[in-house]
Every structure is written in C-alpha cells, then in structure tokens.
Amino acid sequence: MSTNSDEVVYNRQLASVLAKGGPQGYFGYNESHAAIGGYSTWGPFVIWLYAIPGVLFGTGYNTVFWCNMVFGLLCWCVFTWRMDWKHQLAFALGLFCAWLPLRQIFTATSEPLHFFLLAVILAYSRAMADGKRGSTAAALLACVVETIIRPYGVVMFLFPIVYGWKKNCGRLRLAGTVAAALMSVVFSLWAMNTLAAPYSEQSLDFTVFTKMGQGDVPGAVAYFFQKLFAACVSLWADYLQPTLHGGAEQYIVDAAHGFLRVLLFMATILALCLYDTVKKRAIRGKVCSLICAATIFLAILVLYNPLQLRRYSAFLCLLLLMVAAAEDLLVAVLSVPLLVLLVFPAGFAHTDGLPAYNAGMNQQMIQVTEALQQSQDRLTDEKDPWQHTLSFAYGDVHYGYLYALPAGMGIEFDWNTYLADPENTINARYVMVNHDTEAEKRLLEEGWQVLVSTENEIVYERPL
C-alpha cells in the first residue's frame, strides 16, 4: 500500500515504458492530457531516466523504489569520492540528522534522481576548479538535465560558472554556460506545455512572468511580494501553528518540518560564511548554495504554495548540506538542532513508514488486473489512447488500487466530484469508483457496465 498518490503514477508510467515503450493511454488530471504523448504532469524525461536502471527490476509495484536505491547509492559515491574520511563522516552525520533526504530515498517518488543530479553538479563543479578533464561536460550535462526536468533548476548553472571561472577563458566559458542555461529553460518550458499533462488544482502561478512580459515590471514586483506575503501568512497559520500545537495531519507536519529544516540550514550556512570571511577562507561554494536555495525556496512559495515544501525541502536541505560538508567540518554542529527537530514538534521521526503489504487489498487488485487485461486484450488494434485509459475517482477509492492497471494503461486522476457531475465529459473507456457514491450513481444513470466489482472498488466500462 503506497503512502503517496504520486508514487503510483510514477510506477505505472515507468511500467508502460518498460513493457510497451511508452503509455498506450493518457496520464492526466480531470480528463486532461499532454498535447503530444500520454505522459503526466512531470513529462517523459523523468520516466525515461528511471527506465535506465528500471530494466534491472521489471514492471512490479516496487520498481521505482529499487531504482531510487540505485540513485541514492550513486549519489553517495559520486559526491564523496574525492572527500577524506572526516568530511565524509560530517556529511553522513548531517544527512542522518536532516532525515528528509534519507526518507525520500525510501519512497517511489523522483527525488532521489534529483539528488543524484545534484551530486554530479557539485562534485564535478568542484573538480572543474582543480582542472580535472571531463568535469566541465559532466557538470553542465547534469545542469541541463535538471533544468529540463524542473525549470527552476537553471540556478544550478551557478556552480559550474563560479567554480570553473578562469581569467584566461572566463568570458568564453561564461557565454557558453549561459547559452546552455537559456536553451535548457526554453526547452523545459516548451516541454511542460507540450509533452506533459496540465497541472490540476495546484497550477503553477506564472502571473509574475506574464506581467513582466507585458512590460509591467512594477506590477510584477508588487504581485511577487503580495504572493510571498500571503504564502508566509499561510505557512505560519496553516502549517507551523498546527504542528506546534499538535494533532496536525501528516502532510501539514511534513511541510512545517521541511520549512524549519531549510531555515536552519540557511542560517547555519550564512553563519559559516561570516566565520570563513573573518578567517579569510573561500566561501564561493556556500554563497552559491545560499543563492540557489533561496531562489528555489522563493519559487516554491510564489509559483506553488507552502504545501510543496513537504517534498521539495529535502532537495534544498541536501544542497546546503553537501556544499557545507565538502568545505567545512563545522557543519557537524548542525546535528544537535536537527536531532531536536526529529522529535519536536509533533514527533516527526516516529510518523514515517514504508509502504505496507495488505493481503485483502492485493487479492482485490489481482481481480482488477485480470479483468482489465482481458478487456485490453480485445483492443490490441485500438489506437485511440482513451480506449486504454482508466478514470479514477480520487477521494472515493484508495489510489493504491491503481497499481492493478496492466502496464501500458493510462490513468486520469479525477476528483470524485468531477466524475459525479454530468456536465463533465468522461473520455476514458474505464472508470474506477467506490460503491454507493455519487460518481457511481452517474455511471449507472448513463448505462455504464460493470467490468469487475470487489469489496472496495468497482471498475465500469463504457457501454458499447
């Protein structure tokens, strides 16, 4: 039983690539889909990268999980290969106490892939300063891939720029790096609008960039600070206060702890920068990490919402920790306040858990898989992606049952209220709902036929 609804979407897309070469149906939200292809919100590139180690693990429920073990191991090896044992120990201690990055590795989301790319960027950027051959290409390639997957990853180009700067070829290298960054962002934005399904209710807010494109710079600045202020108010009222008082939902606690950890890391790195300045030691890496972390943090609050900190804060913590551990053993002092955060507020360390096996759920999933596979076998020559897509009533049925879909089928993650409304068109051939729900009532009124029925869900098939 998965603990995150995103995990099943990653898994089924990866299974589609490994078994069929790509999704035969559509992945999307509320009956939406990409302009080109059938991939979900994150687009195809993340899934294609996971397919590289994925060929070793097949199309099972835990394929993404095992791929994350590979990316986690590669992250450690790439980042620590040039560090002495003292810095490795400081990094390991900080990593354990930070907890969020470690926890993300033991999931089936895509964060460990970004951890690996981050390790490549930082390790090879530092190698650039030592004149290591091939380091520039490796660092820039990782920056390009990270930016294509997540547009705000463009800030990571700052590391190869700063570490690779040399007086005799600095301008030429800078021009090439900036050009690569710009092309990566443009391609990433094109891919988001073309190769990925639209976001649902948690849409990206590009109002700032829209106003700037219209020449309304004062309006863009005003909107930025207005949105930032609203996000900060929400962060305090909706996340920090409930967590401090106890009894908050787990996703609220996760977001609050993510914010507290990022804040602690940034304050510590800033203090180390001041200390190193007094001691006349280099601070370029730590300054770069602060700039990148602050930029991404603001992007999350202004373009997304504070809730996204429950996931993306792990990347920010790891970014700050990696740079500090590679340059300064004093980062080990972070372990004390980080350990305090593990147990207060809300006993964060004791609420985590790996996905659990549920025998009853597994038996129902077997029935769903067999029924859908038999139905799909009759449609092998059908080219319409909607004929290979199932609409899921989110809120009525546990998303873990979606693992039962045969490899290649697409998933429309629809709200139960969306499916229950007769005004909304259902394009998919199949719909998964629960018993005695408004969504099921609509399907019955429209003459949909039961394909398979179990204790906790029913799959309906479009009437012929």
Tell me what each language-model feature is.
Residues 40, 44-74, 254-263, 352:
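Loop-to-helix entry region of an early transmembrane alpha helix in multi-pass inner-membrane enzymes
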Residues 89-90, 137-141, 178-183, 321, ...:
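Signature aromatic-anchored transmembrane alpha helix within multi-pass, membrane-resident enzymes
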Residues 337-400, 404-406:
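Membrane-embedded, lumen/periplasm-facing catalytic core of multi-pass transferases
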